[in-house]
Amino acid sequence: PRHLEPAGSNRSYVTTSTRTYSLGALRPSTSRSLYSSSPGGAYVTRSSAVRLRSSMPGVRLLQDSVDFSLADAINTEFKNTRTNEKVELQELNDRFADYIDKVRFLEQQNKILLAELEQLKGQGKSRLGDLYEEEMRELRRQVDQLTNDKARVEVERDNLAEDIIRLREKLQEEMLQREEAESTLQSFRQDVDNASLARLDLERKVESLQEEIAFLKKLHDEEIQELQAQIQEQHVQIDVDVSKPDLTAALRDVRQQYESVAAKNLQEAEEWYKSKFADLSEAANRNNDALRQAKQESNEYRRQVQSLTCEVDALKGTNESLERQMREMEENFALEAANYQDTIGRLQDEIQNMKEEMARHLREYQDLLNVKMALDIEIATYRKLLEGEESRISLPLPNFSSLNLRETNLESLPLVDTHSKRTLLIKTVETRDGQVINETSQHHDDLE
């Protein structure tokens, strides 16, 4: 019998069949053992060769008497045994032919499965391997590109951050300058107000001086008129009193004195007025120059403040746009990174599935190889059995005519064992990781 178990089983079956025929002097003994074990998934089958053993027990025959009935009985029994063996051999040949057909069929199936396996390996190697390598190269290229883009974006971000810091510092400086300009402008406005007040004061002073000059001029004219009237009166008196020369000379002296005093006073008044007017004009010019310069500086500072305000607004807009672009780039990069991570995870799952499928194909291939090995071993076993049967059949028959028969007493002959004995040994061995963990044996004796 043939015992096959799936690969990976740890149970071993050992079946021993012993068949013994004992017939008087001729005892053919046939022993056949079939060991089948599968430690770790490998099948091992061993069969012992068929042995034909002829024994001649101590049969004592007398020379003077020959009993041919015993020889006929032995020949008849031997012929029956040979006939039974031929029938059994014919059945064994038929079974072996069926087994050969089955082995050929299994070999063909094995070849078909091997061809399919090679085809699957070739397809997997040509299609899946190339696709996997190409996809991995593409993913590596994309990862490198994303790494370069990330580095470039980080550099741009750092540059923009530095620009923002520099612009903020510049903004602070401009704000400080603006505050200083506003404070300076405020002081200049105070100076302008003071200059305006001084100018108004000077204008009032000029008006008062002009009024005073007009009053003095009017007073001078009145004095001149009075002096002229007095001179005319004195001249009349001189004309009347011609006979008095001393009075005329005195009047002339007085008139000269008055004229010299009036001319001196008039000259002094004109000089004072001119000097005062020159001083006031110079002060007014100075104040006008200071006012004009203050106005120019105020306009210049106002223009600077407006330009700085516009520049600050432009820098704020640029900063906001750059920050918005940076946020958008970070969001896009995070989204692309998540997509690439999902793609990498999906590809890794596909690779794992492919590895599992390849492992399953390899296990199936290993199982097929184990089955093929077991079949080869079993074929070799049956071949040895057939060779043993052929060698047993080809043995020459014993020549009973050449036996040295002697006279004997039939009653002294031993009893002839006319029954057949068949011993069946079933041995079960259970192994795990190449070590025997359980072993049982069962003996069955059958008499025929």
UniProtKB/Swiss-Prot annotation:
<feature type="modified residue" description="Phosphoserine; by CDK5 and CDK1">
    <location>
        <position position="38"/>
    </location>
</feature>
<comment type="function">
    <text>Involved with LARP6 in the stabilization of type I collagen mRNAs for CO1A1 and CO1A2.</text>
</comment>
<feature type="cross-link" description="Glycyl lysine isopeptide (Lys-Gly) (interchain with G-Cter in SUMO2)">
    <location>
        <position position="86"/>
    </location>
</feature>
<feature type="modified residue" description="Phosphoserine">
    <location>
        <position position="420"/>
    </location>
</feature>
<feature type="cross-link" description="Glycyl lysine isopeptide (Lys-Gly) (interchain with G-Cter in SUMO2)">
    <location>
        <position position="421"/>
    </location>
</feature>
<feature type="modified residue" description="Phosphoserine">
    <location>
        <position position="37"/>
    </location>
</feature>
<feature type="modified residue" description="N6-succinyllysine; alternate">
    <location>
        <position position="170"/>
    </location>
</feature>
<dbReference type="GO" id="GO:0005882">
    <property type="term" value="C:intermediate filament"/>
</dbReference>
<feature type="cross-link" description="Glycyl lysine isopeptide (Lys-Gly) (interchain with G-Cter in SUMO2); alternate">
    <location>
        <position position="111"/>
    </location>
</feature>
<keyword id="KW-0325">Glycoprotein</keyword>
<feature type="modified residue" description="Phosphothreonine">
    <location>
        <position position="428"/>
    </location>
</feature>
<feature type="modified residue" description="Phosphoserine">
    <location>
        <position position="307"/>
    </location>
</feature>
<feature type="modified residue" description="Phosphoserine">
    <location>
        <position position="31"/>
    </location>
</feature>
<feature type="glycosylation site" description="O-linked (GlcNAc) serine; alternate">
    <location>
        <position position="17"/>
    </location>
</feature>
<keyword id="KW-0206">Cytoskeleton</keyword>
<feature type="modified residue" description="Phosphoserine; by PKC; alternate">
    <location>
        <position position="17"/>
    </location>
</feature>
<dbReference type="GO" id="GO:0030496">
    <property type="term" value="C:midbody"/>
</dbReference>
<feature type="modified residue" description="Phosphoserine">
    <location>
        <position position="33"/>
    </location>
</feature>
<feature type="modified residue" description="Phosphoserine">
    <location>
        <position position="412"/>
    </location>
</feature>
<feature type="modified residue" description="N6-acetyllysine">
    <location>
        <position position="217"/>
    </location>
</feature>
<feature type="modified residue" description="Phosphothreonine">
    <location>
        <position position="418"/>
    </location>
</feature>
<feature type="modified residue" description="N6-succinyllysine; alternate">
    <location>
        <position position="276"/>
    </location>
</feature>
<feature type="cross-link" description="Glycyl lysine isopeptide (Lys-Gly) (interchain with G-Cter in SUMO2); alternate">
    <location>
        <position position="205"/>
    </location>
</feature>
<dbReference type="GO" id="GO:0016363">
    <property type="term" value="C:nuclear matrix"/>
</dbReference>
<dbReference type="GO" id="GO:0005886">
    <property type="term" value="C:plasma membrane"/>
</dbReference>
<feature type="region of interest" description="Linker 12">
    <location>
        <begin position="228"/>
        <end position="250"/>
    </location>
</feature>
<feature type="modified residue" description="N6-acetyllysine; alternate">
    <location>
        <position position="102"/>
    </location>
</feature>
<feature type="modified residue" description="Phosphotyrosine">
    <location>
        <position position="43"/>
    </location>
</feature>
<feature type="modified residue" description="N6-acetyllysine">
    <location>
        <position position="150"/>
    </location>
</feature>
<feature type="modified residue" description="Phosphoserine">
    <location>
        <position position="402"/>
    </location>
</feature>
<feature type="modified residue" description="N6-acetyllysine; alternate">
    <location>
        <position position="205"/>
    </location>
</feature>
<feature type="modified residue" description="Phosphothreonine">
    <location>
        <position position="440"/>
    </location>
</feature>
<dbReference type="GO" id="GO:0005737">
    <property type="term" value="C:cytoplasm"/>
</dbReference>
<feature type="modified residue" description="N6-acetyllysine; alternate">
    <location>
        <position position="111"/>
    </location>
</feature>
<keyword id="KW-0472">Membrane</keyword>
<feature type="modified residue" description="Phosphothreonine">
    <location>
        <position position="408"/>
    </location>
</feature>
<keyword id="KW-0007">Acetylation</keyword>
<dbReference type="GO" id="GO:0030424">
    <property type="term" value="C:axon"/>
</dbReference>
<keyword id="KW-1017">Isopeptide bond</keyword>
<feature type="coiled-coil region">
    <location>
        <begin position="285"/>
        <end position="389"/>
    </location>
</feature>
<dbReference type="GO" id="GO:0071225">
    <property type="term" value="P:cellular response to muramyl dipeptide"/>
</dbReference>
<dbReference type="GO" id="GO:0045109">
    <property type="term" value="P:intermediate filament organization"/>
</dbReference>
